[in-house]
Amino acid sequence: MVLSPTDKTNVKTAWGHVGAQAGEYGAEALERMFLSFPTTKTYFPHFDLSHGSAQVKAHGKKVGDALTQAVGHLDDLPGALSALSDLHAYKLRVDPVNFKLLSHCLLVTLALHHPQDFTPAVHASLDKFLSNVSTVLTSKYR
């Protein structure tokens, strides 16, 4: 899906509200994903997956940092996320459906923390953005 100029503005504005909490929200979304979709835990057998775990927080920061990088490169997501795509495709071998599950949990997390900013238009733009990120991260699986 191509992000329109309005989508790009919505994504940048919404992510601007996230700011320094990107890692925190990433960890919350991961925790929500593990609770809602227990099969996703199989990729983290070495993690302490309990609430507030330092390992989940650290991985949440990686997720938040990657999304912040992606927001900064909306016109070149494949270039910005190439190394991460390689990692997930060739080393970690994460089932592509898990990116959709995490995207959903990220949307829920953002809606909970920023209900006043989470309009239907912003929701749609963020959904398109996260879908594009998921597509890039799974592009090297083929």
UniProtKB/Swiss-Prot annotation:
O2 binds at H59. GO terms for molecular function: haptoglobin binding; heme binding; iron ion binding; organic acid binding; oxygen binding; oxygen carrier activity; peroxidase activity. Heme b binds at H88. It comes from the Eukaryota. Keywords: Heme, Iron, Metal-binding, Oxygen transport, Phosphoprotein, Transport. The modification N6-succinyllysine is found at K8, K12, K41. GO terms for cellular component: blood microparticle; haptoglobin-hemoglobin complex; hemoglobin complex. The modification Phosphotyrosine is found at Y25. Residues 2-142 form the Globin domain. Gene3D superfamilies: Globins. Red blood cells. The modification Phosphothreonine is found at T9, T109, T135, T138. One of its GO terms (biological process) is hydrogen peroxide catabolic process. The modification Phosphoserine is found at S4, S36, S50, S103, S125, S139. InterPro entries: Globin, Globin-like_sf, Globin/Proto, Hemoglobin_a-typ, Hemoglobin_oxygen_transport, Hemoglobin_pi. Heterotetramer of two alpha chains and two beta chains. Belongs to the globin family. This is Hemoglobin subunit alpha.
